[in-house]
């Protein structure tokens, strides 16, 4: 948020304004009214303070950075570890108690569905680079198979 509600840097008539010059005061007011504030929970300290963070007026979403959180917990990428699951539950509980949204990234459709079932209300699907890699791999495999079939059928 822009002051007096936050400490966001100011830049106007650029990409987030579609490069359209506008009245700065109305732009600030509109951004403050409609902007979404997402805070990342990526450490045990963030988990321990999730309730206090969620209680901050103006915070809309607590987003779990699952790789960073598991890494800082000393259990990298062990997303089924009981300590990791307890940390996630703690953040979900904080969001429920304070009426905030919990969010996280899911890398597969199945992961996204599980996150939604657990109570996450904001779920991002896949990393852009990973989705791009999967698409390229699939396409190249089809091309190679097609080429191999043609070579053997001549």
Language model regions located:
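Conserved, mostly hydrophobic/aromatic
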Residues: 53, 65, 115
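C-terminal helical cap(s) of enzyme catalytic domains, especially alpha/beta-barrels
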Residues: 1-4, 129-153
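Glycine-enriched alpha-helix->loop->beta-strand junction motifs that scaffold or abut catalytic
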Residues: 1-2, 55-61, 117-123
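Conserved anion-binding
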Residues: 1-57, 68-71, 152-153
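Glycine-rich tight-turn/loop motif centered on a GG-T
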Residues: 2-12, 72-86, 126-128
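Hydrophobic faces of well-ordered beta-strands that scaffold small-molecule active sites
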Residues: 37-42, 62-64, 102-105, 122-125
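Glycine-rich phosphate-binding active-site loops on the catalytic face of alpha/beta enzymes
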Residues: 62-71, 120-139
């Amino acid at each position: 948020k822009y002051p007096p509600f936050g400490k966001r840097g100011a830049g106007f008539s650029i990409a987030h304004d579609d490069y359209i010059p506008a009245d700065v005061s109305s732009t600030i007011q509109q951004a403050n009214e409609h902007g979404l504030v997402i805070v990342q929970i990526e450490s045990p300290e963030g988990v321990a303070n999730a309730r206090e963070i969620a209680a901050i007026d103006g915070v809309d979403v607590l987003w779990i950075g699952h790789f960073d959180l598991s890494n800082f917990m000393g259990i990298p990428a062990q997303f089924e570890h009981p300590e990791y699951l307890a940390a996630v539950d703690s953040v979900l509980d904080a969001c429920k108690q304070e009426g905030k949204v919990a969010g996280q990234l899911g890398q597969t459709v199945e992961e996204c569905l599980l996150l939604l079932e657990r109570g996450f209300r904001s779920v991002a699907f896949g990393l852009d680079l990973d989705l791009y890699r999967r698409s390229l791999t699939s396409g190249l495999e089809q091309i190679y198979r097609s080429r191999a079939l043609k070579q053997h059928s001549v």
